[in-house]
């Protein structure tokens, strides 16, 4: 909720229910944010649910749609399909007419992502996502949170002209790549971090979310997936949930609890 406005800020009013894309420091009761990174929450969305929206939706929109340019009819491979990023990517890709291949680590998570619309679900502990992608003609876009360990396999999974966007390094910071394989697929690899983008880029991302994605949220076509909410004083418990990797969607700190 807006408590104060800086000089010259327009389009917002004290008392407005908003969500914001932060550069960090979100474990707080009050934050100061550039006005361009603050937007009204989608109609019908609770403040608690809205807390799960900015980081994940901005990450997916900026990388999958703005950078990689996913088109209707193309195939998206998203790793970690049951994560906050993954559940958002699946829903948005399907809403805009794309096919989705995703990886998960358990049968329970596989069931959830299928319900969200994933077309092909791969349990990475048992099956090969490269083969799964090849069976559907290859991935046009890969959204990768793993990094080094998956680099070569992501290239192998590409369709001709495919685009890989690396946004995480859970599988290491280094990977070996046969450039011939990338050349043969006429593929591209990008690596981005939302946190370190300049304020004007973040403002543009948030503006596009309001224009293109908020109507989908308000219509119930896509929604933030909340695994659990905890009060701020239980932040250590929230991190333990994430470390155990048993969650589906986002874990949110509830400052009103």
What are these model-derived regions, one by one?
Residues 13, 43-46, 69-75, 137:
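Short helix-loop-beta connector
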Residues 128-137:
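Short amphipathic alpha-helix with an adjacent loop that forms part of the alpha/beta core around
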Residues 1-25:
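Glycine-rich beta-strand-centered segment in the early N-terminal region that forms part
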Residues 104, 149-222, 254-257:
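Glycine-rich phosphate-binding loop and adjacent beta-alpha segment
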Residues 214, 219-228, 236-257:
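C-terminal capping/lid region of NAD(P)-dependent oxidoreductase domains
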Residues 51-126:
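Mid-domain Rossmann-like dinucleotide-binding core that forms the NAD(H)/NADP(H) cofactor-binding site
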Residues 22-35:
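A structural motif shared across PLP-dependent enzymes of the aminotransferase-like
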Residues 81, 146, 169:
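NAD(P)H cofactor-binding loop motif with strongest signal on the N-terminal glycine-rich segment
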